[in-house]
Amino acid sequence: MKTKSNLIIISIFLIDFFTKKWILNNYEIFDSIKIFPMIKITYIRNYGIALGLFQSYSNLIRILIIVISIFILLFIFYMKNLCKDLLSNLGYSIIIGGSFGNIFDRIFYGSVIDFIDIYIYKWHFPVFNFADISIFIGFLILIYNKKIFIVNT
């Protein structure tokens, strides 16, 4: 199970990495291109946390966000290693892969690269990326499996 979960983590990270690399190589900041009804590629940089909170804070706060993110990631690794069931392990692995992607961005780019822009009429989601989708799906799996931060004994 460990090899499969490592493969999931690495795959999620690489998909996230290469989609962001493609955005960096092909778009200018704030470029926005409609690709489907209700879906655009809009290249933005998120200097804050989820949903763009704390965007305008100092570099010290940004460093603190990285440190806190790493500690949360270590905790999720710990919880994953305590899990015995396949579905929970899958959920944690997907979360870890996505978390690595966003932490990588913060460390090497100084911000998270977001580009998936979904809107329905005037209702508009914050722009996000593949790592965010992965983290969300991982949490949905844990909630479905009723194992979020609960250890099987």
From Swiss-Prot:
Disulfide bonds: none annotated. Its EC number is 3.4.23.36. Keywords: Aspartyl protease, Cell membrane, Hydrolase, Membrane, Protease, Transmembrane, Transmembrane helix. It is found in: Cell membrane. InterPro entries: Peptidase_A8. Pfam families: Peptidase_A8. The keyword Zinc does not apply. GO terms for cellular component: plasma membrane. It catalyses: Release of signal peptides from bacterial membrane prolipoproteins. Hydrolyzes -Xaa-Yaa-Zaa-|-(S,diacylglyceryl)Cys-, in which Xaa is hydrophobic (preferably Leu), and Yaa (Ala or Ser) and Zaa (Gly or Ala) have small, neutral side chains. Pathway: Protein modification; lipoprotein biosynthesis (signal peptide cleavage). It is a multi-pass membrane protein. Its main location: membrane. One of its GO terms (biological process) is proteolysis. The chain crosses the membrane at residues 7-27, 59-79, 93-113, 123-143. The active site is at D114, D132. GO terms for molecular function: aspartic-type endopeptidase activity. HAMAP family: LspA (MF_00161). NCBIfam families: lspA (TIGR00077). PANTHER family: LIPOPROTEIN SIGNAL PEPTIDASE. Belongs to the peptidase A8 family. This protein specifically catalyzes the removal of signal peptides from prolipoproteins. This is Lipoprotein signal peptidase.
